[in-house]
Amino acid sequence: MQESFENSVKNMLTIIGEDPNREGLIKTPERVYKAFKFLTSGYEQDPKEVLGDALFTSSNNEMVLMRNIEFYSLCEHHLLPIIGRVHVAYIPNGKVVGLSKIPRMVNIYARRLQIQEQMTEQIAKALEDVIAPKGVGVVVEARHMCVEMRGVEKINSTTTTSALRGCFIKNADTRREFFSLINSPRETHF
């Protein structure tokens, strides 16, 4: 598989008018293979298993929010970077998940070929399926290099997507609290 991938990169370099045997490009096919192997490593992991490994009984019934989880992914249409942040909240229903598992889950989904809308839904669904909370809220804000580097070339444009479940849809106060918290000042100093 690696050899086939590297040969494809060599062919691509040749097609665009480059010499894959010149000094700066000799190891490029191998480097690109390793980069893509890492950038798509999310296919080798199950986010629901990661979440399920750290479930704890809790009487907490207030919002748990982890915001500003930075990520990068690859657009499935152009294989160009998506760079952004995710805000994830849920209202427990007898169980909480270990905090480190939320960014791990985000990374698993981000390290797949993606569209932002799908990734937002996948994160919400995984939390909903594994911990069965009273509600889930996910907001993803990202820059898409397929928009900035080609096509319309709109540098610094951002896309925001959301997925709301349970009480985040049904209860306007919960929804307001969530959006208020994720929009409060971002810098925290301890």
UniProtKB/Swiss-Prot annotation:
* Gene Ontology MF terms: GTP binding; GTP cyclohydrolase I activity; zinc ion binding
Q: Name one GO cellular component term.
A: cytoplasm
Q: Which UniProt keywords apply?
A: GTP-binding, Hydrolase, Metal-binding, Nucleotide-binding, One-carbon metabolism, Zinc
Q: Which reaction does it catalyse?
A: GTP + H2O = 7,8-dihydroneopterin 3'-triphosphate + formate + H(+)
Broadest EC class assigned to this enzyme = hydrolase
Q: Does the keyword Aminoacyl-tRNA synthetase apply?
A: no
Which residues hold Zn(2+)? C75, H78, C146
Which pathway does the database say it acts in? Cofactor biosynthesis; 7,8-dihydroneopterin triphosphate biosynthesis; 7,8-dihydroneopterin triphosphate from GTP: step 1/1
A biological process term (GO) from this entry:
tetrahydrobiopterin biosynthetic process
**Which InterPro entries has this protein been placed in?**
GTP-CH-I_C/QueF (IPR043133), GTP-CH-I_N (IPR043134), GTP_CycHdrlase_I (IPR001474), GTP_CycHdrlase_I_CS (IPR018234), GTP_CycHdrlase_I_dom (IPR020602)
Q: What is its EC number?
A: 3.5.4.16
- Check the record and name the Pfam families matching this protein: GTP_cyclohydroI
Domain of life where this protein originates:
Bacteria
Q: How does it assemble?
A: Homomer.
Which family is this protein grouped under? Belongs to the GTP cyclohydrolase I family.
Database matches in HAMAP family: FolE
What is the name attached to this protein's record? GTP cyclohydrolase 1
Q: Which gene encodes it?
A: folE
